Amino acid sequence: EIAVDSYEIPERISRQVILRDSHEVFPFSARSARNQDLDHTIPYREGVPGQTRASNLGPLSRKAHRGKTHGGWQLEQPAPGVFHWRSPGGYHYRVGRNGTFRQGSDKLSQILWNADYRKPPDG
């Protein structure tokens, strides 16, 4: 995976993310990725190498970006192109190529959430 040490996103990484994520990755959004900001899923910190890479980026509108940064929404990207959101009310959403799936706020949602983090067995 291509990674750079700067906050600015090189064109080759931008193209890779836009091809992977054709739409904004906020739950239930239908906005084209081409017109959105590319947001660092894990916020960028000066001096930490390799943070700007496709597996740490996703297209978000400014409004969704502000919701993530200041509005209580939590975001994780356990695999490139798979986005897990937690709303301020505790609801879980999984966003990927096939759209948004509401996973609720109960024990089952936690099981589904954790399933994306499991590594496949070797073999």
Model regions and ranges:
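Short helix-coil boundary/hinge micro-motifs
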Residues: 1-123
